[in-house]
Swiss-Prot record:
Membrane spanning residue stretches: 64-84
Subcellular location field: Membrane
Protein name: Uncharacterized protein YDR278C
Membrane topology: Single-pass membrane protein
Main location: membrane
Entry superkingdom: Eukaryota
Keyword tags: Membrane, Transmembrane, Transmembrane helix
GO CC, any one term: membrane
Tagged with keyword Transmembrane helix: yes
């Protein structure tokens, strides 16, 4: 599965890509291990990269819920960062929903 879209946001651009890779588990008893990677790129005097690596066992409903949460963040985060100019922010989300913000020069 590979999904991507582009959208304009207040004269800016939003690029989103969603990839899902299913690989075999080394143990063999669990079957396949879904691995999702979600990345968003906002461009309006700032560049924000959100990367979510997910590598765990759960059902399809949980994956859909997680993807939906980050699609909501797609429209929530730029509203809080519109006042920041000439600043690059890199936000890394972990599977426990904690994130670290690294401001880049």
């Amino acid at each position: 599965m590979n999904v991507s879209f582009r959208s304009n946001y207040h004269q800016g651009t939003i690029r989103c890509s969603v990839t899902a890779i299913t690989s075999r588990s080394h143990r063999g008893d669990r079957g396949s291990t879904p691995r999702f990677g979600v990345s968003f790129l906002f461009s309006r005097k700032i560049h924000m990269l959100i990367h979510l690596p997910l590598l765990f066992h759960c059902d399809a409903t949980s994956h859909i819920l997680l993807i939906s949460i980050f699609f909501l963040l797609l429209f929530a985060l730029p509203q809080h960062t519109m006042g920041i100019n000439s600043t690059s922010c890199c936000v890394h989300f972990s599977s426990s929903y904690n994130y670290n913000v690294h401001k880049l020069a």
